[in-house]
From Swiss-Prot:
This is Core protein VP7. Glycans are attached at residue 287. Belongs to the orbivirus VP7 family. Gene3D superfamilies: 2.60.120.170, Bluetongue Virus 10, subunit 1, domain 1 (1.10.250.10), Bluetongue Virus 10, subunit 1, domain 3 (1.10.170.10). It comes from Bluetongue virus 2 (isolate USA) (BTV 2). The keyword Glycoprotein applies.
Length: 349
């Protein structure tokens, strides 16, 4: 299936080079389009030309690219337009070994297949405590009954620790059971002034320490912590104290947008509003997938089918921009006039 996807990418990108009818095509583009169009026309009985000039010819070439995109992604879009019918035989065109594919396309598909079939350490973009169900007021003393050290979450990436005079204790428990981190990068600081439960202000005196695995860590410096070694706090002073521990970032096996080059840009290209026809077409295609149909996914996609669909659909969007096809989509009423931000914004409501 990798070669089928690579051929689909190659052919669509070749079509995207047809910026004008009289352009001098590169030799490899002529070879790719010549073989692909001949095979496609023979199997589907369409009339795609290598140099589309009229609207009908541009539509035919775009429909060829749409067929290839859907076939490579394994999507059966169904009846979405009175002007277009998906040709399931296109998969046979893409399976033709005579159609060459570029090194770039092959490498990109190999990257998608390779990265989605395994896991690796990645810097996570969300706060470590993002999904906590409760939070505490920053800078306000809090102590549970029968305890001398209390650690609480006070933000999506922050905890604060209240310590009685002379108290010491481990606080790594508050990190455990969250996010399955491989490494957590922390910074700790003394809270110089904090509010007691009665509302009066109190100062944290110098001498409070935070240690990892028995080694004292300097305040205000990034600490690499594996989440397993003892994270110990100690208040040797004769007054209550508070410290703040911030998770600068953490590394885990969860997939991110860095698993594929320019995945963020590909997603933006897919979900951008070009006109109402593209908006309706993209929505209809993504309705047949697990991806959201109008707005980008909340979390990075982590399976091959989703990332491959985004890559192919982003390339189809470029072809749409170049060929400027005009056809109807069921349930879509195009609005005449120039594209404005207000029109684009209204399409997502």
């Amino acid at each position: 299936m990798d070669t089928i996807a690579a051929r689909a990418l190659t052919v669509m990108r070749a079509c995207a080079t047809l910026q004008e009818a009289r352009i001098v095509l590169e030799a490899n583009v002529m070879e790719i389009l010549g073989i692909a169009i001949n095979r496609y026309n023979g199997l589907t009985l369409r009339g795609v030309t290598m140099r589309p000039t009229s609207l009908a010819q541009r539509n035919e070439m775009f429909f060829m690219c749409l067929d290839m995109m859907l076939s490579a992604a394994g999507i059966n879009v169904g009846p979405i337009s009175p002007d277009y019918t998906q040709h399931m035989a296109t998969i046979g065109v893409l399976a033709t070994p005579e159609i060459p594919f570029t090194t770039e396309a092959a490498n990109e598909i190999a990257r998608v297949t390779g990265e989605t079939s395994t896991w690796g350490p990645a810097r996570q973009p969300y706060g470590f405590f993002l999904e906590t169900e409760e939070t505490f007021q920053p800078g306000r003393w809090f102590m549970r009954a029968a305890q001398a050290v209390a650690a609480v979450v006070c933000g999506p990436d922050m905890i604060q620790v209240s310590l009685n005079a002379g108290a010491r204790g481990d606080v790594q428990q508050i990190f455990q059971g969250r996010n399955d981190p491989m490494m957590i990068y922390l910074v700790w600081r003394r809270i110089e002034n904090f509010a007691m439960a009665q509302g009066n202000s109190q100062q944290t005196q110098a001498g409070v320490t935070v240690s990892v695995g028995g080694v004292d860590m300097r305040a205000g410096r990034i600490i690499a912590w594996d989440g397993q070694a003892a994270l110990h706090v100690h208040n040797p002073t004769q007054q209550n104290a508070m410290v703040q521990i911030q998770v600068v970032f953490y590394i885990s096996m969860d997939k991110t947008l860095n698993q594929y080059p320019a995945l963020t840009a590909e997603i933006f290209n897919v979900y951008s509003f070009r006109d109402h026809t593209w908006h309706g077409l993209r929505t209809a295609i993504l309705n047949r997938t697990t991806l959201p149909n109008m707005l980008p996914p909340i979390f990075p996609p982590n399976d091959r089918d989703s990332i491959l669909t985004l890559l192919l659909l982003s390339t189809l969007a470029d072809v749409y921009t170049v060929l400027r096809p005009e056809f109807a989509i069921h349930g879509v009423n195009p609005m005449p006039g120039p594209l404005t931000r207000a029109i684009a914004r209204a399409a997502y409501v």
